[in-house]
Amino acid sequence: MNWGGALGVLLGGGATLLLSFLCMPALLPVASRLLLLPRALLSMASGSPPSQPSPASGSGYVPGSVSAAFVTCPNEKVAKEIARAVVEKRLAACVNLIPQITSIYEWKGKIEEDSEVLMMIKTQSSLVPALTEFVRSVHPYEVAEVIALPVEQGNPPYLHWVHQVTESVSGSGKALP
C-alpha cells in the first residue's frame, strides 16, 4: 500500500508531497528544508489564510510593525536636509546616511552611473505612506526612490523606541506641521 498517497488524500495535496519525501530516505534532506519554509508559504500551499502577526514572545513587538525605508539622494546636503525634516516631523525615529554609494540604473533609455548618498530610515510601517509622500514633495529627483522593508526581528528596546518616537504621528494618522 502507498501510505504516502493514502495519507496525502486524507491530509490534503500539500501533505502528499511532504509524505512522499519522508517515505524516501534519500530525499530527507529536501524534506527537512521544506519544513523550514515560512508559515505564510506553507499556509498558502495548504489553501488556508496566513495567521495574523502576533507579538514576539515576551517582547511585545509585532513583527513587521517597524520598517526600514531606503531613499537615495544626489548628495549629503540634500540627504541631511531630508533626514532632519523626517525626524523633526516624527515620520522617522532615526536616519542613517551612507555616503558614496554608486548607483547604476536605466533612465530614459540610457544606462546611468551616479554617486549618491543612501538614507536608511527607521519608522513605523504605518507611517511609510506619509513618509513617502513627504520625501516625494521635497526630493530633487523627478522619481525619488523610496522603498521600505518590514523589520521582522530586532532588539526589542530599540524597536519599542522607534514606536515611542513616532507615536504622536501614527496616532493622528498625519505628519506634524
Swiss-Prot record:
Signal sequence bounds: 1-32
Gene Ontology cellular-component terms listed: membrane; mitochondrion
GO terms for MF: copper ion binding; enzyme binding
Pfam families associated with the record: CutA1
GO biological process, one term: protein localization
UniProt keyword terms in alphabetical order: Signal
SUPFAM superfamilies: GlnB-like
Record text on subunit structure and interactions: Homotrimer.
Family to which the UniProt record says this protein belongs: Belongs to the CutA family.
Task of the protein: May form part of a complex of membrane proteins attached to acetylcholinesterase (AChE).
Name of the protein: Protein CutA
Gene behind this protein: Cuta
